[in-house]
Amino acid sequence: MATTNGNKKILDLKRWEFCAILPTTTQAGTFVASSRHFRQQQLCVRSNSEAFIYNPSEDGWVPITSPGLAGTFGAGAAGVSGAWSTGSTVGAASLTATGGSTTTIITNQTLARDLRGYKVLIMAGPNAGAVLDIASNTIAANAVITVTPAQAVAFSASTVYRLLTPRWYVLGAGTLAAASFRVYDYATNTWTTLSQTGLPASLGTDGKLIATPSMIDGDFKSFATGTATSATGTTLVQTGKTWATSQWINSQVRITGGTGAGQIRTITANTADTLTVATWTTTPDVTSTYAISGNDNFLYYIGNNAVTMYRYDITANTWSTLSPIAARANAPQAGMSGHWVHSVPVSESDWNNESAILNGRYIYSFQGGGSANLHRYDIAGNTWATITYAPNAEVFSTGTKYALHKGTLYIQKDQIGRWYAYDFARSEMFPWGMMLYPQGSAIVGDTA
């Protein structure tokens, strides 16, 4: 009997492709940190003195100036990308223009790169609140940035701005000392030493630096938006909102338009319709629109085979030890993870319901150390919980790597070539595309 084969080949079959190799071999502690900007570049720090940037569109690496890290490079070293440019803060002004026109900003910075395609946020002064594309810039002291679209009012010496360009925070390992914690600014091609005071005396087991930025994949990620119905010197109110009490603590609110546009504040408390913040420079009113997002001012560090969790305040350049209401059940060990989950798809209503949103509220962390344990930190509630998921028979240890994309965490199990995908909305682990060529050995180092 004649038959017809109606089967069709699978479209978009998962497959692995080789990319350009790092110019030099990796070593224990080598880590990769991805920017969250439109070019999605990756910084690789190979040692205290070697670093490279990878351009995925060109599949190539370029060395950059030495990180100049102190300490003994190895396990525990970590890096993460933040959204703010040199000298910028969340609650105060620091980058002030020296003049300009309706299409140009004369900066107070020495820019070292072509920043076309990136954005600039106007914090105060003429055109406050505007988020503009950079069309071109000069490479010199007091660099001139040309922006689009043209604005109604010329920029001036009262313009306060932020370049929304990559900024990588890098933490070394071994015995910590001055220059163990540094930041690389992409726009100026400079490294700056930051304070390590408040961290442990030494770091020697896997660790993670975690950012909660307002900008994701080249644009602002807002968890709630609206227009104020009233405000005071320390509050913003929108009557009719039905937020859960305290759900926005440690998030940030940005005034996107109207009175007070450009201001950003950390939320210290909230009721069903009221946000409490530090004192506004200009009190918002009924013309003020706002957006709530992740907090650019905080970094978190977990790891070092300890349950202790640290938070870095970028504005103050200080570290503090957090005291969660419920401590983490087990210390993170070799092969641990740490990711802020912010973009579970909109189809998951419980993750995106503004009145009790889950997106942006939690940091998830696999314990590592030969276990399958998964823990979750509540940023607003300052508490840890252990997450039940299935199947949970696979364990993770030295060399396991993780990469977050939207609502899924992709997991490379050490060097053996097996991959898994963890779905946060479903609390479920799935098998994923097997690598055809396992690595020769497990790599100790961070990925972000």
Language-model segments: what does each one mean?
Residues 4-6, 48, 112-118, 176-178, ...:
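A short, compositionally biased
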Residues 14, 56-59, 185-189, 313-317, ...:
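Short loop/turn segments that connect beta-strands within beta-propeller blades
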Residues 21, 67-69, 84-157, 196-199, ...:
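Autoprocessing Asn-cyclization modules and mimics
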Residues 60, 153-154, 282-285, 417, ...:
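Short, surface-exposed beta-strand-loop junctions and turns on beta-sheet-rich folds
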